Amino acid sequence: MQKSLITKWLFISCIMVIAMIVIGGITRLTGSGLSIVEWRPVTGILPPFSFESWQAEFAKYKAFPEYNSINYGMTLSQFKFIYLLEFVHRLLGRITALIYIVPLIYFYFKDVIKNRDILPYIIALLLFCVQGFMGWYMVKSGLLNSPSVSHFRLAFHLIIAVIIYHILFYQLIKNRCDILLIPSQTDLKLPLIFSGIAITVIYVQIFLGAMVAGLDAGLIYNSFPLMGDNFIPMEIKDNFFNLANLHDPVFIQFIHRLGGYSVFLVVVVLVICLLKIEHPKLNKIAYFLMIALLMQISTGIITLLYSVPIIIASIHQLFAIILLSIIIWCYFIIKTS
């Protein structure tokens, strides 16, 4: 009974974090992230209701660079749309934190979660706190001189969410999955190594994807597999190893493409390793991996070719989490077998 409660709680928490990641991506893609120019963790739980309240929020927004540089002349109705998207994102963040924290306190004091098992839950709790601050720290970067947020802060904001999800999902499968019985003579070293490498490469790729979004780098070189007429674009060919390139949309898009090739190669090798073991459960994971990988690659290419359509770009982001989840599941099964 207690194990079932923990499993349900962790499952709901994981779904909420995924929803936060996807809605956060939509907020970025629609240019809604800078519409709320204040950080009010407690008093900001309700949106404006009266016409006067909306006018007051709109007046605050008009005082910052995004309105004057990008959205000058925006109507109140248009402002309401971007405001409510950002509001939903922030509200969902609060709800997600409560869904995680309140049961955690209950489970701990009821001794459902033992002291020996509490550490990952505490780390996730601390990361929830850091994430709230990081979200505002990111937004603040777009309220100064530039009408866009720092792509570095955006990437860290996303990666913290992914780490939180990783911790919760790992605890979920730890509570839910049985240990797989594999013959002792089976060599699991290679699939364990490549599942670890795959997790690392996907983390890097998610970070780069956030930087692409932050720099609007998906709106340039909308061709594949070449960038224009070249594999390496001319703008960076002669100046590749320069730290200034980390602010260059062309360079970041190119590196993100390389990351995609890396993910493909590593996951394909992992799939081959799993299929060679000839175990039904691991073979099933291999098939799931290939489906998720193909979906991730195809949505990424479509996102690029069609200049970042919001729905496809959101699905692309979602499948990054799905692909990561399957590999974490794979890693857990191999490690505990």
Swiss-Prot record:
Biological processes annotated in GO: heme A biosynthetic process
Main location: membrane
Entry EC number(s): 1.17.99.9
UniProt-annotated location(s): Cell membrane
UniProt membrane topology term: Multi-pass membrane protein
Organism superkingdom: Bacteria
Enzyme class per UniProt: oxidoreductase
Cross-referenced Pfam families: COX15-CtaA
Transmembrane segments: 6-26, 93-113, 118-138, 154-174, 192-212, 258-278, 285-305, 308-328
UniProt GO cellular component terms: plasma membrane
Record keywords, A-Z: Cell membrane, Heme biosynthesis, Iron, Membrane, Metal-binding, Oxidoreductase, Transmembrane, Transmembrane helix
GO molecular function term, any single one: oxidoreductase activity, acting on NAD(P)H, heme protein as acceptor
Cofactors demanded by this protein: heme b
Binding residues for heme: 256, 316
Catalyzed reactions per annotation: Fe(II)-heme o + 2 A + H2O = Fe(II)-heme a + 2 AH2
Annotated pathway: Porphyrin-containing compound metabolism; heme A biosynthesis; heme A from heme O: step 1/1
Similarity comment text for this entry: Belongs to the COX15/CtaA family. Type 2 subfamily.
Biological role stated in the UniProt entry: Catalyzes the conversion of heme O to heme A by two successive hydroxylations of the methyl group at C8. The first hydroxylation forms heme I, the second hydroxylation results in an unstable dihydroxymethyl group, which spontaneously dehydrates, resulting in the formyl group of heme A.
Subunit and partners: Interacts with CtaB.
Record HAMAP family: HemeA_synth_type2
Designated name of the protein: Heme A synthase
Gene from which this protein is expressed: ctaA
